[in-house]
Amino acid sequence: RPDVSGKKVELEFDVCPRGRLRCPRRVVAEMKDRWGPLGAECDSVPGYVHDPVGDLAARAGAGVLQKYHGRALLITTGACAVNCRYCFRRHFPYAEESAAANQWQQAIGYLAGDTSITELLLSGGDPLSLSTSKLRSLSDQLKPLTHIKRLRFHTRLPIVLPERVDAEFTDWLSSLPYQLVFVVHANHANELDGPVTSALRALGRAGATVLNQSVLLKGVNDSSEDLAALSERLFDAGVLPYYLHLLDKVQGAAHFEVPVD
């Protein structure tokens, strides 16, 4: 029961052996159901599976997933700043599919062999959990691949660990020859405090288009008031509210489902 800012946070660590927890101190006391393990994660619910979005069938090897023409996704790492309890990749075999683990070469080789790929998504895990020097190593190796026009980062770190968006990182972004897109992940207006807003605006100043994706979660943001407040706060931070996803039916997350009539 961590004591954070004078608040006792009750977490069910001993209920489910699969209930790993990782969460920065600044957010551990906020909306605990999204961060802390719950016994409901061990419930077996029909229709909830390990791979709800078909990632395994899309594996091209070396951490590359390709589902669509002209676009590839790179599993840069399995690491995240938080373990979101509803993550659709919570059962993904990161030990087998992480491009950073082989120093990028195999993934670069695959991307070089398909000149139809114009957009590269950096995902994971969270690409910003890698150091800027590691990301710079990747961008250096991508330079000869002139068919790649856009880099798209899917990241939660600017929301939960805004200090990651530092001067070294934004200087590197500004130096890149790509159209840059950041898809950040905030679900509730309370996540967008002053430091987070500053980090999001810094991404925009570095030349990135910044979008937000949210997941509709029972007990977290399942009201029109919550969603409207989130959109307003995102606009104030220079971020376009872009996606609102229904819950992906991943095993262990059924308690977050919002019924759609």
Regions found by a protein language model. Give the residues of each.
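Surface-exposed cleft-lining segments at the edges of enzyme active sites
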Residues: Y94-E96, G124-G125, F153
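N-terminal pre-triad scaffold of radical SAM enzymes
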Residues: A57-C87
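Conserved catalytic-core segments centered on acid/base and nucleophilic motifs
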Residues: L74-I75, C87, E119-L122, P127-L128
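Short, intrinsically disordered, charge-balanced linker/junction segments flanking boundaries
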Residues: F13, P259-D261
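Conserved AdoMet/S-adenosylmethionine-binding subsite of the radical SAM
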Residues: Q105-E119, L128-P259
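Flexible, acidic/Gly-rich N-terminal and inter-domain linker regions that tether
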Residues: R1-Q66
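Generic hydrophobic, aliphatic-rich segments that mediate packing or membrane embedding
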Residues: D14, V27, A72, C80-N83, ...
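Iron-sulfur (Fe-S) cluster-binding segments and ferredoxin-like electron-carrier domains
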Residues: C87-A99
